[in-house]
């Protein structure tokens, strides 16, 4: 079997409760939602997938990948195996040294999920008042990527 892309949830929890997400519903994730995949288990899964033609790993699922404080280490594992590391995130934690570590680890694609075009619509959809912070994080990350050549 040929598997060129894998979506691997390294973190089950989320720091948002977006209107459109099943995780935000009562009982949406149950008790296991706080679990994180260990680095060892992740590397074992990647080792197995590489032999099937793996080219891209999406480090997300229903959980928020940036809640995993070792996200940069997961990216490094993907890169060591010759694949690309993609992520979708609400962007709330992508700032400062954490953001730089994730970028410098070799992230190939990082999408900020911003539902709403101003603080009011963002709040209505994402149940968060962090619109300005997330926009600032996005702009800072863009500058860092451009300035560092990452």
Write out the residue ranges for each language-model feature:
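Conserved alpha-helical substructure of the radical SAM core
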Residues: 1-109, 120, 124-125, 129-132, ...
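Short, intrinsically disordered, charge-balanced linker/junction segments flanking boundaries
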Residues: 144-150
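The feature captures the short pre-catalytic strand/loop hairpin that immediately precedes
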Residues: 116
């Amino acid at each position: 079997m040929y598997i060129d892309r894998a979506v691997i949830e390294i973190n089950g929890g989320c720091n948002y409760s977006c209107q459109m997400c099943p995780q935000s519903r009562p009982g949406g994730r149950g008790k296991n939602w706080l679990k994180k995949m260990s680095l060892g288990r992740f590397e074992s899964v990647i080792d197995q997938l590489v032999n099937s033609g793996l080219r891209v790993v999406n480090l997300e699922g229903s959980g928020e990948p940036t809640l995993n404080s070792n996200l940069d280490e997961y990216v490094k594992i993907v890169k060591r195996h010759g694949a690309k590391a993609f992520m979708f995130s609400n962007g709330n934690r992508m700032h400062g040294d954490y953001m730089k570590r994730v970028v410098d680890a070799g992230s190939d694609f990082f999408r900020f999920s911003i539902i709403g075009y101003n603080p009011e619509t963002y709040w209505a959809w994402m149940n968060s008042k962090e619109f300005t912070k997330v926009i600032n994080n996005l702009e800072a990350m863009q500058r860092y990527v451009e300035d560092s050549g990452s």
